[in-house]
């Protein structure tokens, strides 16, 4: 019988955790045995190690606001699981000292490694720094993960952890031919294949699964009732924006959204502006205060997927001003809930939002164009928005639903299991 060790820092905190949990549930639904190994209840010692790592990584100064990780330490149950080498080990987000870079050489043969960001083939940064003032994002910059990290690097002060950690990862992984890596988007597939660490590796496209039975549209009656309960009228134009940390997370484009809304005020009348209501989820605080001159309701962190789906469905449009997304979970969930999306045409979002069909995409990171896209969405007729919304759900069903992703996932599991069995025979 196939047994999978599913390893992730968390199964509840963040998009990577939710994706990992969904992959585990796909296995369980098909009768595959799964051991979930995570740090959700790991205790004080694990927390202490993460604090040490957090302090040490701050010794590198590189002006990149993205999360940085050293991964000096391992969570003991993860390393202990390597004793069960006949089981399939599927690694998800292994940062926050879930698996140490010094234990990478112990990863069992024929394991699966799912990348939820760029950390594995970069230094200590989870994404290459994106310059919002560069219209093409980071694509035209000198990329260290392709050209190699240098000990002396302009712009880095203090300890150059990126150089050291990249060297350790490269030594441990670049020659491994038995690990299968999966990535959730074509953008990440292209970048991983160009990286020095993974350029010779077996890398597959495996998008995050979306539960279309949970993320689905409300009926017209349910939608009106939900909006009424939240204090919104039928004539209000609801714009939803979601991110861990809310609009304060720089990678999620809070600054770009603020600039876009400031532009939007000059593109519409005061009467139309008063109809627009913002809903922000994902931040810790709940409040009702203006954001860039627009009425705004911050609803906090939402843990119930059904409630989140209802929130998406109640909105007229979802805005995703992210600078970079490995996949675009919010975009896919919104579309599955029949809510069209406005976003920059960047990174993993390009796989999900099709300009003019499932939403509007604009050139990165043109906030005036973003404002115009919101305006265009606002002035679409109700039927035009509904048509776009239906196309969006159909696209998610056809490309990211459980049935589609599970078929590819089980094919990979069976392939890896066959290789393990062949190794046993040898």
What is the meaning of each model-derived region?
Residues 182, 232-252, 258-261:
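Conserved donor-binding/catalytic core segment of Leloir-type glycosyltransferases
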Residues 187, 209:
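Carbohydrate-associated surface elements
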Residues 268-277, 282-309:
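Nucleotide-activated donor-binding/catalytic signature segment of Leloir-type glycosyltransferases, i.e.
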Residues 310-315:
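Short alpha-helical donor nucleotide-sugar binding micro-motif in glycosyltransferases
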Residues 323:
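Aromatic "clamp/platform" in nucleotide-sugar-dependent glycosyltransferases that forms part
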Residues 340-343:
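Short hydrophobic beta-strand element within catalytic cores of glycosyltransferases
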Residues 355-356, 360-367, 376-382:
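Conserved acidic donor-binding segment of nucleotide-sugar-dependent glycosyltransferases
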Residues 384-399, 405-411:
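A short, well-ordered alpha-helix in the C-terminal region of glycosyltransferases
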């Amino acid at each position: 019988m196939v047994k999978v060790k599913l390893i992730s820092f968390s199964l509840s905190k963040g998009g990577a955790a939710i994706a990992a949990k969904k992959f585990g549930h796909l296995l369980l639904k098909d009768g595959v045995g799964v051991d979930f190994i995570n740090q959700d209840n790991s205790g004080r010692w694990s927390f202490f190690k993460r604090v040490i790592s957090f302090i040490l990584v701050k010794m590198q100064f590189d002006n990149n606001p993205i999360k940085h990780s050293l991964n000096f330490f391992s969570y003991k149950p993860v390393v202990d699981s390597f004793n069960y080498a006949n089981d399939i080990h599927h690694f998800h987000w292994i940062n926050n000292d879930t698996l140490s870079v010094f234990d990478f050489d112990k990863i069992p043969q024929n394991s699966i490694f799912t990348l939820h960001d760029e950390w594995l083939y970069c230094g200590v940064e989870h994404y290459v720094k994106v310059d919002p003032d560069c219209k093409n994002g980071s694509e035209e910059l000198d990329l260290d993960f392709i050209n190699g990290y240098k000990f002396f690097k302009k712009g880095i002060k203090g300890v150059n952890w990126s150089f050291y950690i990249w060297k350790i990862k490269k030594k441990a992984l670049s020659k491994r031919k038995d690990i299968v890596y999966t990535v959730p988007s074509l953008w990440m597939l292209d970048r991983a294949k160009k990286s020095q660490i993974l350029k010779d590796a077996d890398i597959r496209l495996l998008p995050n699964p979306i539960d279309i039975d949970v993320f689905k549209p409300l009926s017209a009656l349910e939608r009106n009732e939900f909006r009424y309960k939240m204090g919104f009228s039928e004539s209000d134009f609801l714009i939803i924006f979601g991110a861990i940390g809310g609009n304060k997370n720089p990678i999620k484009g809070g600054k770009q959204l603020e600039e876009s809304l400031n532009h939007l005020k000059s593109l519409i009348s005061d009467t139309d502006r008063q109809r627009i209501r913002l809903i922000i989820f994902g931040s810790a605080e709940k409040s009702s205060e203006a954001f860039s001159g627009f009425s705004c309701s911050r609803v906090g962190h939402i843990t119930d997927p059904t409630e989140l789906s209802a929130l998406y469905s109640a909105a007229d449009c979802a805005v995703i001003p992210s600078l970079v997304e490995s996949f675009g979970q919010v975009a896919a969930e919104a579309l599955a809930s029949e809510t069209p999306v406005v976003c920059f045409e960047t990174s993993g979002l390009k796989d999900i939002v099709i300009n003019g069909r499932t939403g509007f995409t604009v050139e990165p990171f043109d906030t005036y164009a973003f404002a115009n896209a919101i305006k265009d969405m606002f002035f679409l007729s109700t039927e035009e928005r509904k048509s776009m919304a239906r196309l969006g759900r159909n696209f998610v069903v056809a490309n990211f639903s459980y049935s589609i992703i599970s078929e590819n996932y089980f094919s990979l599991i069976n392939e890896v299991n066959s290789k393990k069995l062949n190794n046993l025979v040898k």
